[in-house]
Swiss-Prot record:
Role: Catalyzes the transfer of a two-carbon ketol group from a ketose donor to an aldose acceptor, via a covalent intermediate with the cofactor thiamine pyrophosphate.
UniProt keyword terms in alphabetical order: Calcium, Magnesium, Metal-binding, Thiamine pyrophosphate, Transferase
Reaction(s) catalysed (UniProt annotation): D-sedoheptulose 7-phosphate + D-glyceraldehyde 3-phosphate = aldehydo-D-ribose 5-phosphate + D-xylulose 5-phosphate
Family: Belongs to the transketolase family.
Cofactor(s) the protein needs: Mg(2+); Ca(2+); Mn(2+); Co(2+)
GO molecular function, one term: metal ion binding
InterPro entries according to UniProt: THDP-binding, Transketo_C/PFOR_II, Transketolase-like_C_2, Transketolase-like_Pyr-bd, Transketolase_bac-like, Transketolase_BS, Transketolase_CS, Transketolase_fam
Catalytic-site annotation from UniProt: E412 (proton donor)
Name by which UniProt lists this protein: Transketolase 1
UniProt organism field: Vibrio cholerae serotype O1 (strain ATCC 39315 / El Tor Inaba N16961)
Pfam families given in the database record: Transket_pyr (PF02779), Transketolase_C_1 (PF22613), Transketolase_N (PF00456)
Amino acid sequence: MSSRKQLANAIRALSMDGVQKANSGHPGAPMGMADIAEVLWRSHLNHNPQNPNWADRDRFVLSNGHGSMLIYSLLHLSGYELSIDDLKNFRQLHSKTPGHPEYGYAPGIETTTGPLGQGITNAVGMAIAEKALAAQFNKPGHDIVDHFTYVFMGDGCLMEGISHEACSLAGTLGLGKLIAFWDDNGISIDGHVEGWFSDDTPKRFEAYGWHVIPAVDGHDADAINAAIEAAKAETSRPTLICTKTIIGFGSPNKAGSHDCHGAPLGNDEIKAAREFLGWEHAPFEIPADIYAAWDAKQAGASKEAAWNEKFAAYAKAYPAEAAEYKRRVAGELPANWEAATSEIIANLQANPANIASRKASQNALEAFGKLLPEFMGGSADLAPSNLTMWSGSKSLTAEDASGNYIHYGVREFGMTAIINGIALHGGFVPYGATFLMFMEYARNAMRMAALMKVQNIQVYTHDSIGLGEDGPTHQPVEQIASLRMTPNMSTWRPCDQVESAVAWKLAIERKDAPSALIFSRQNLAQQPRSAEQVANIAKGGYILKDCAGQPELILIATGSEVELAVAAYEQLSAEGKAVRVVSMPSTDAFDKQDAAYREAVLPAAVTKRIAIEAGIADFWYKYVGFGGRIIGMTSFGESAPAGELFKLFGFTTENVVKQAKELLA
């Protein structure tokens, strides 16, 4: 039997070799955490390399994602479909082993990590999902949801502010199945961290309500194993295991220094490390006995088979719950979804209401929520303003995790990355909310959702200068454009309750990308529509008002400015002008339509166009051309009543008509 140290050295060797072959990467963390990884993965982690998507597997997150050769080595050694050639292709174009772990590339990668602090935050989301699913589905004698979430994180993760947001909430929610390992090696890129990171981390986490196991020797397998056993035994609090490690362990001349953090060791140092570790094998060569000791395929298959037997017994005793669990974990919508939601939208069109689109959003939640037990909502301490709670909302707490609504507190970034974790875990359709202005705090987590192609629905209310007296600190200007310009992001700014419901429906159906739903504070007039127009809302842009024959002018508007465009249309039409109004709640959805549809809505021959939106003006040139005009924002807002601000910045019928006449002259 191979010694534990040699099993860990296999990780060190592969990590050194992979980084060296790529001529870039981070060997220090994988070499420093190899002993911890060996104990966790071989003695504790419940997983099946032959089915990386087994629903009740333990989750493992490498929050310090720069140490990616660690997880690639673990996946390869354990028997996942990640070959030695894949490891040799580390950091190369179209490889399964990119520089930072990316969800969807190599099997067994649970989340994309790299921006520090977001991995631990995703893990908090996964642990919340596990606790909530267990509370909703487990029955006495039938624990079908019962798994741990393990995280590796470094000093950088703990310095990032998002780690405070996430770990504070994790303590409050009593996430007893969350176990984090702090790689306490005292080194970051700039050198020894005591000059910029002198926190008492154990006391910090104790203050959060965590179970803290301090001063564990990260190179002592028995000490590591005992710490993990103690962590698993603590069921009411998350655990932080503080592991003291040597970065680059095994490198005789670079271990313990920043020299091995983010650069290849070099051939000479790798040779010296091999001698120091007693690793006598060639680069990328793993002996058969090491492979055999690491191989988790048979053990994993046995664990999943045992769970399948448990689930079969559960299904026999609780057939309805078992069917519902399978539906939700598979990410399937209820069978009656399409018919029920289409009827809801038709009824909204037939019963006009002039309400704020944030209220329209709440009405959509009320209607759709009754169909979706998988909804998991929340807000960053703005529920009464975002209107994200509905009659079926039940708060999720440490004592009762069967709820479907998370009070995130004032933690926009944490909320958004936690929701990424909930979505990655599966079993829920998660949404969060804040003011549109404060998506700025959460921007990178939404970008990560788009990069990973996961469902993260964000409700952004108070969407413009219409916010009024709170002033420019709270009035978004450039935020909508930045969301629209994010690849794989679906952004909607509806003009009334019907467009709002359609936006919600599509966001719920869109499993492979995040959605930003942008709503107003102020009341908006509902627009009359035909059934065909209602159907065309889903296309992102459609003709709302039209003239006989070819228009001479097209007004394009979104959200609260649609009624402004309609008022100008009516005045111009009464004066004999041939005008069309295009409502464009989602530019990305419109851009995905075929050329014929886009030409039918915005004919190339009609060059006189005005875009109207209380957001940054520059975005709209792609739709109006340089010969068109934009009534939009070119500065920050002001503190004043909303009506005065709309007048000040030109969002009036008079100004739209004036601009139109100048363009037509």
